[in-house]
Curated annotation (Swiss-Prot):
Organism encoding this protein: Geobacter sp. (strain M21)
Gene: kdsA
Top-level division of the source organism's lineage: Bacteria
Family: Belongs to the KdsA family.
Pfam family, one: DAHP_synth_1
Cellular component terms per the entry's GO annotation: cytoplasm
Catalytic activity: D-arabinose 5-phosphate + phosphoenolpyruvate + H2O = 3-deoxy-alpha-D-manno-2-octulosonate-8-phosphate + phosphate
Subcellular location: Cytoplasm
Source organism phylogeny: Bacteria, Pseudomonadati, Thermodesulfobacteriota, Desulfuromonadia, Geobacterales
PANTHER family for the chain: PHOSPHO-2-DEHYDRO-3-DEOXYHEPTONATE ALDOLASE
Protein's pathway: Carbohydrate biosynthesis; 3-deoxy-D-manno-octulosonate biosynthesis; 3-deoxy-D-manno-octulosonate from D-ribulose 5-phosphate: step 2/3; Bacterial outer membrane biogenesis; lipopolysaccharide biosynthesis
Protein name in the entry: 2-dehydro-3-deoxyphosphooctonate aldolase
EC annotation from Swiss-Prot or TrEMBL: 2.5.1.55
Amino acid sequence: MTREITVGGVKIGGGRPLALVAGPCVIENETATLRCAERLMSICNGVGISLIFKASYDKANRTSVTAFRGPGMKEGLRILAKVKEALGVPVLSDIHSIEQVEPAADVLDVLQIPAFLCRQTDLLVAAANTGKVINVKKGQFLAPWDMKNVVGKISSCGNENIILTERGASFGYNNLVVDMRSFPIMRSTGYPVIFDATHSVQLPGGEGTSSGGQREYVEFLSRAAVAAGVDGIFMEVHEEPEQALCDGPNSVRLDDMPALLKKLKSIDAIVNQ
């Protein structure tokens, strides 16, 4: 059993039902972001699953220098604050530097540490010192048991509000693979584990100047992860993935979410009997 973490009105871990972290890869504009959040809230309320809304204000590690990165921190946080106020949903976004920690913590319910930055001690400590919930994505280059050291850096600051996310491991060039053993190994730290089902099917840099993806495998890996006992699922979604400004090839179409979430909820209920 993992520790129960409270994010706004959402509880993750501790034997609680499966939670969902979902939203667009990047904030494209205010209207689209609010529309996506409203749609997700409606879907989750209909299925009966708790939602934490996610969206990045800056995609700092895009493949190409010309790729769309987002509106930036100030405008992005303003939009996320509006989503939070309008819908009453907890919000999550990535932080990339120590300078971003304080302003982000003023708005966000969850500070997310990107996978490429998961070993950056100063960033982890600065985030931990806010007292906020910290979601750390396991680096594609890390073994699952190495996350205990990441946990130690955060908990050494007195912050036990920790969530860990599996997002696949590098498998040769331009590919990722998911080792299902990582879920019980990471949960053995005592903290909830989330599966990032959409980044795990990403093909990093696979399109030359952008990343590819195989969204057709999202459902299969999600079902397997829930059966393996994860505490939550992370998915990037879009109304029209083909038109998305970031990570369209591995984003789930919003229209497909109700049926998928119903399946995942049913599997979770069996696992937690």
